[in-house]
């Protein structure tokens, strides 16, 4: 319901959703629980931006039309964990010491203002003295015309050729990698540079005092700040899900507590997005699986006369005809729903929930575990038989393959019979005729065919429930040009 409202809100032309910054401050907040530790300027700046975003969201949600967005308009009161006063007071306290670039203000305290003013004056004095020495040295030919003061080890120095280093008295702090330049601090500015170093130490101590002071104000509110961060994360996640749903033109479908599938024009999300970029059209999937109890409920809606107690769909048809895509579409969309995402399908669709999703897709053979393709499938089937029940959705691709067809088909049929007896739901793809016959004769199991255009010898990628499909092996062999004699 929250997702449905968020999707509607984001497409409302009268509204503009606030944008802000959410930073993970859990580590910093955990650290400052200890007395004597503090948040640095960058962390305070991040906290300020996060609190400002929380305030924006509070105002935005509070102003929403409560009849149109009942859940989101109430989230500001029911979910936001701190008051406006707290947020405003905290932002004001941070703004007094941190500027809009995230740096500590000169006037964060009178003492800091004095120190920085003296540092600036001392640096100006050193710079003027160095420039005077530099001009004299250039006039005497000791230094190049393009030479300029530079910084080494936090002190202003002059770049001097080694041959002239004794002509400029002072302290050598460094030399270039080539050895063609030494960096000298002239004796005339040593005392001033020393004073600058002392002032920088005073500045660090005053900055630390200021940070400790504001951290002491933040410390009691740590639980509230963490709750605010969690709330912002929830809102951001909800917005991300809504944007993803809107990009797919997805819906939040009608749902029911009991397991069932009643899908109209459903799309695999990856195919949908990729084909859209390529200007292609995806063939949608319509499918219904339910047991008789669910389907006899007042809200049951059969599709095209499909029997209401068909829980397991056995899909057959040609290779590259769309069997696996149907299977993966069911797997993907069901998992998306149960993760709280919108799903791309027609609004007339209805979805149920499953406690277990058991999937056997692909080849899991392993040299390390001494498993062949067939052994890996059998191991999965053992797991399925053990855990499948009436709240389970099975998704099995190429059921029974990987061994001698006669034996593999027989084992697959026995496993399918057991899974059906346990009341499981499922979508299964196969080429085995015995499984098609089993589906035709067994209550709870139904055939599905991937349609094929015999005239043009090409798959239609459409699922038809209630009939078994053909592999069209002869037609495909003829199409690719195998000799007629074969």
Question: What does each model-found stretch correspond to?
Answer:
Residues 248-249, 256-486:
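ATPase nucleotide-binding head domains, primarily ABC-like/P-loop NTPase cores
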Residues 1-111, 115, 221-224, 228-242, ...:
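Conserved amphipathic alpha-helical "coupling/scaffold" segments
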Residues 6, 102-115, 175-181, 196, ...:
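Short hinge/gating elements
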Residues 178-201, 464-486:
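Short, exposed interaction patches on small structured surface elements
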Residues 134-152, 242-265:
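Long, charged, glycine-rich C-terminal linkers/tails
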Residues 3, 10, 47, 54, ...:
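Amphipathic alpha-helical coiled-coil segments
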Residues 147-148, 152-183, 193, 255-284:
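SMC-family hinge/dimerization module
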Residues 114-164:
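Extended, Lys/Arg-enriched charged tracts that mediate electrostatic binding to polyanionic substrates
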């Amino acid at each position: 319901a929250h997702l449905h409202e968020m999707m509607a809100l984001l497409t409302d032309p009268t509204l503009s959703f606030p944008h802000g910054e959410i930073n993970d401050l859990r580590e910093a907040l955990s650290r400052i629980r200890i007395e004597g530790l503090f948040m640095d300027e960058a962390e305070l700046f991040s906290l300020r931006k996060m609190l400002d975003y929380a305030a924006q969201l509070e105002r935005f949600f509070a102003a929403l039309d409560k009849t149109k967005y009942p859940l989101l308009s109430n989230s500001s009161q029911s979910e936001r964990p701190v008051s406006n006063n707290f947020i405003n007071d905290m932002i004001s306290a941070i703004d007094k010491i941190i500027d809009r670039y995230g740096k500590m203000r000169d006037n964060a305290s009178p003492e800091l203002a004095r120190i920085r003013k003296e540092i600036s004056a001392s640096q100006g004095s050193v710079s003027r003295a160095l420039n005077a020495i530099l001009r004299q040295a250039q006039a005497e030919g000791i230094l190049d015309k393009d030479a300029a003061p530079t910084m080494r080890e936090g002190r202003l120095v002059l770049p001097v050729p080694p041959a002239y280093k004794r002509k400029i008295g002072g302290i050598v702090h460094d030399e270039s990698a080539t050895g063609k330049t030494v960096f000298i601090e002239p004796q005339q500015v040593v005392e001033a540079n020393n004073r600058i170093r002392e002032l920088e130490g005073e500045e660090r101590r005053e900055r630390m005092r200021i940070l400790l002071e504001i951290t002491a104000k933040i410390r009691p509110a740590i639980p509230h700040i963490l709750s605010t961060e969690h709330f912002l994360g929830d809102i951001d996640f909800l917005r991300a899900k809504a944007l993803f749903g809107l990009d797919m033109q997805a819906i939040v479908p009608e749902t029911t507590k009991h397991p069932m599938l009643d899908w109209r024009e459903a799309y695999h999300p990856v195919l949908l997005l990729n084909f859209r970029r390529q200007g292609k059209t995806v063939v949608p999937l319509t499918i219904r699986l339910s047991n008789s109890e669910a389907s006899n409920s007042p809200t049951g809606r059969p599709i095209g006369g499909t029997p209401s107690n068909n829980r397991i769909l056995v899909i057959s048809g040609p290779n590259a005809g769309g069997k696996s895509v149907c299977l993966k579409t069911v797997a993907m969309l069901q998992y998306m729903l149960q993760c709280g995402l919108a799903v791309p399908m027609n609004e007339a669709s209805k979805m149920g929930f499953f406690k277990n999703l058991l999937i056997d897709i692909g080849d899991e053979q392993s040299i390390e575990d001494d498993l062949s393709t067939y052994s890996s499938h059998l191991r999965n089937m053992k797991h399925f038989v053990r855990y499948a029940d009436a709240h389970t959705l099975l998704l099995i691709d190429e059921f029974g393959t990987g061994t001698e067809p006669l034996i593999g088909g027989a084992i697959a049929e026995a496993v399918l019979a057991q899974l059906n007896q346990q009341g499981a739901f499922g979508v299964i793809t196969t080429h085995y005729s015995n499984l098609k016959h089993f589906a035709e004769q067994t209550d709870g199991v139904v055939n599905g065919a991937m349609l094929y255009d015999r005239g043009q010898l090409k798959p239609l990628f459409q699922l038809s429930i209630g009939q078994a499909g053909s592999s069209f092996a002869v037609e495909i062999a003829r199409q690719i040009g195998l000799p007629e004699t074969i």
